[in-house]
Amino acid sequence: GDLPVCGETCFGGTCNTPGCVCAWPVCTR
């Protein structure tokens, strides 16, 4: 299956997308 795409803006070090981590200011895998 396809993995979720990371890239949302993150605040407080948390990302809503599973498997993504906050690399301020955006989420990345």
Swiss-Prot record:
The keyword Disulfide bond applies. Belongs to the cyclotide family. Moebius subfamily. Probably participates in a plant defense mechanism. InterPro entries: Cyclotide, Cyclotide_moebius_CS, Cyclotide_sf. GO terms for biological process: defense response. Keywords: Disulfide bond, Knottin, Plant defense. There is a cross-link at residues 1-29 (Cyclopeptide (Gly-Arg)). SUPFAM superfamilies: Cyclotides. The keyword Disulfide bond applies. It comes from Psychotria leiocarpa. This is a cyclic peptide. The presence of a 'disulfide through disulfide knot' structurally defines this protein as a knottin. PROSITE patterns: CYCLOTIDE (PS51052), CYCLOTIDE_MOEBIUS (PS60009). This is Cyclotide psyleio C. Disulfide bonds join 6-20, 10-22, 15-27.
